[in-house]
């Protein structure tokens, strides 16, 4: 048992988050995403499933321990709605809120066309699939660094 960790963070998910390096992406995807197929091409080959959670809840847990890259102008990206790239579905607004809270500032999500998103997700470190069935709940989060003195 560990203290002060969100209980949503399983041992496998914590391993993935710890093993990622600065600049690695994590694909955080909805229940409709072809996660098994995409995960097999990622750096780690790992698919972590979080069934029964909303995307917002999963994002909150992950962002409680994952630093977002602040060297990158677009460290968090979202899958665009097919046929309406400017549309922001409710699931994306909810995750945007969690990202803004985690960063302490507004950081708009950059849009990526659906098939370009799949290509970028294949180059991610791992895939986390959430049980949220709402479409376009697909994100790429780029890991940043933790500043400080060695201990």
PLM region spans:
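Glycine-rich, aromatic-bearing surface loops/beta-hairpins
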Residues: 83-151
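Short linear motifs at secondary-structure transitions and domain/linker junctions
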Residues: 1-5, 20-23, 53-57, 100-105, ...
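Short glycine-rich, polar/acidic loop-and-turn segments at beta strand-coil junctions
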Residues: 30-33, 54, 66, 132
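Long, hydrophobic N-terminal alpha-helical segment
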Residues: 1-51
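Generic secondary-structure signature for well-ordered alpha-helical cores
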Residues: 6, 10, 14, 18-22, ...
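Conserved active-site and cofactor/substrate-binding residues in soluble primary-metabolism enzymes
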Residues: 4, 8-12, 21, 53-57, ...
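Structural motif
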Residues: 24-27, 45-48, 69-79, 106-107, ...
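Long, charge-dense
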Residues: 50-73, 84
């Amino acid at each position: 048992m560990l203290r002060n960790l969100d209980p949503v963070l399983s041992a496998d998910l914590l391993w993935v988050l710890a093993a990622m390096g600065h600049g690695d992406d994590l694909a955080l995807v909805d229940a409709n995403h072809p996660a098994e197929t995409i995960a097999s091409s990622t750096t780690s080959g790992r698919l972590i499933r979080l069934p029964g959670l909303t995307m917002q809840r999963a994002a909150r847990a992950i962002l409680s321990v994952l630093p977002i890259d602040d060297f990158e102008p677009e460290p968090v990206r979202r899958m665009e709605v097919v046929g309406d790239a400017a549309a922001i579905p409710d699931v994306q607004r909810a995750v945007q809120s969690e990202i803004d809270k985690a960063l302490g500032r507004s950081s708009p999500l950059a849009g990526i066309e659906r098939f370009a998103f799949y290509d970028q997700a294949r180059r991610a470190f791992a895939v986390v699939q959430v049980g949220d069935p709402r479409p376009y709940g697909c994100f790429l989060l780029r890991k940043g660094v933790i500043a400080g003195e060695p201990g």
